[in-house]
């Protein structure tokens, strides 16, 4: 799972395009329970257009919905639950 995403992010040069070092994966996809969607956490907001580009690339290539959240925009209680199964995919 994590390796698939990492290879995908490297292939599409996502880390450089978004100017980020890592992308968090959480939820059911991170736990390997089912693959109904992919939840991604970004440490900083790359802007609307870049978020939408990432979302469309993930959805097109994995054929499932993708949700993207920004870490500093989450309520602390939500971040607590996100952190329980958060895995980071590192790009550089």
For each predicted feature, which ranges?
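Catalytic core of pol beta-like nucleotidyltransferases
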Residues: 1-25, 30-35, 43-92
């Amino acid at each position: 799972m994590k390796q698939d995403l990492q290879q995908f992010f490297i292939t599409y040069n996502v880390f450089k395009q978004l100017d980020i070092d890592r992308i968090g994966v959480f939820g059911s996809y991170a736990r390997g329970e089912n693959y109904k969607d992919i939840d991604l956490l970004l440490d900083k907001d790359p802007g609307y257009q870049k978020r939408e580009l990432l979302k469309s690339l993930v959805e097109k290539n994995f054929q499932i919905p993708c949700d993207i959240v920004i870490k500093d925009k989450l309520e602390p209680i939500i971040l607590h639950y996100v952190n329980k199964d958060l895995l980071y995919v590192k790009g550089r």
